Every structure is written in C-alpha cells, then in structure tokens.
C-alpha cells in the first residue's frame, strides 16, 4: 500500500489512530470538540489500513488528553493508539486500555440512581463485558451497552 500523508503533521498535540471507521466523530464528541475550540482538529474518516481494512484518524493540535478522556476513547475504540507529539516528533505512543472501573466519566441512565440525585455521589461503573461492551452501575446495578452509553 502506498504511503500518502493525508493530514499534515502537527507540531505539538495528540494523534488518535486505529479508531474503527465511522467512530471518529463520536470520539470528537466525547472530547468536547465544538466550533468554538481554540485549537485545530483534523479528522480523517475511512482511511485505508492494512491492519483494520479502514480506520479513522484524529489529530488535535496543542492539546493533550487526560485520564478520563482516554477512558472514554477506550469505550469507543478499545484498540486505539495514542501518540503524543512534541516538536513534530512522537514523544510517547501507547494503546488505550479499558479500565476495570470507570469513575466519574459517565452518567447512569437510571434516573432514580443515587448518582443522578442531588447527593454528592460520583458515578461508578464496572466493565461486565468488553466485546460486546457492557457496563454496570455499582450503585443501582443498571447495565448499559454501547448504544445506551453514547445516546
């Protein structure tokens, strides 16, 4: 396969690679990217890949992701690769990992759950299954699949 640079290099920031084709928009959504951001975001959708057939690639200039953002990406793209770019070079590269518990990153779909009341309780979910993705609230035991999580 011929190597072609489809999106220009970034000086500093984050590259999210190996996102399943079509899920890049969802990744951008959970990262809170919107029209008023003060950094450049590039999204390539349906890029040919030897490993995956097709994939999405996201480049975010001048922004580095925190643990909660990486956890959210792992829910959408469990095999995504994160590259930290500094001065046009890869300074760090790693694959996201789906944690055994997600604390404070999602909202429980059960409106009666204690995490959705005025109580100062942070949401907490355990991973029941990775394929297909199923998580369970540790407080009310409501289970949610991928469609429940991102709608």
From Swiss-Prot:
- Its function? Involved in allosteric regulation of aspartate carbamoyltransferase.
- How the protein assembles, per its UniProt entry? Contains catalytic and regulatory chains.
Q: Which residues does the record give as Zn(2+) binding sites?
A: 108, 113, 137, 140
Q: Which GO terms describe its cellular component?
A: aspartate carbamoyltransferase complex
The cofactor binding remark recorded in the entry reads:
Binds 1 zinc ion per subunit.
Alphabetized PANTHER family for the sequence: ASPARTATE CARBAMOYLTRANSFERASE REGULATORY CHAIN
Q: Transmembrane region positions?
A: none
Keywords, sorted A to Z: Metal-binding, Pyrimidine biosynthesis, Zinc
What are this entry's molecular-function GO terms?
A: metal ion binding
Q: Which HAMAP family does the protein's record reference?
A: Asp_carb_tr_reg
Protein name as catalogued: Aspartate carbamoyltransferase regulatory chain
Instruction: Quote the Pfam families the UniProt record gives.
Output: PyrI (PF01948), PyrI_C (PF02748)
Please list the cofactors this protein needs: Zn(2+)
Family, according to the entry, reads as follows: Belongs to the PyrI family.
Q: What is the lineage of its organism?
A: Archaea, Methanobacteriati, Thermoplasmatota, Thermoplasmata, Thermoplasmatales
Q: Which residues form a coiled coil?
A: none
Q: What's the name of its gene?
A: pyrI
Give the top-rank taxon of the lineage listed in the UniProt record for this protein: Archaea
């Amino acid at each position: 396969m011929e190597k072609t640079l489809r999106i220009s290099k970034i000086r500093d920031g984050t590259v999210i690679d190996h996102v399943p084709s079509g899920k890049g928009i969802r990744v951008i959504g959970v990262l809170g990217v919107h029209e008023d951001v003060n950094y450049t975001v590039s999204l390539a959708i349906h890029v040919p890949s030897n490993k995956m057939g097709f994939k999405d690639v996201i480049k975010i200039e001048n922004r580095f992701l925190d643990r909660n953002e990486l956890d959210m990406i792992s829910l959408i793209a469990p095999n995504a690769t994160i590259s930290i770019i500094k001065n046009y070079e890869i300074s760090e590269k790693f694959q996201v990992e789906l944690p055994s518990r997600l604390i404070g990153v999602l909202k429980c779909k059960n409106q009666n759950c204690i995490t959705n009341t005025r109580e100062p309780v942070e949401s907490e979910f355990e991973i029941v299954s990775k394929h297909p993705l199923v998580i369970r609230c540790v407080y009310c035991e409501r289970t949610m699949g991928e469609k429940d999580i991102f709608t």
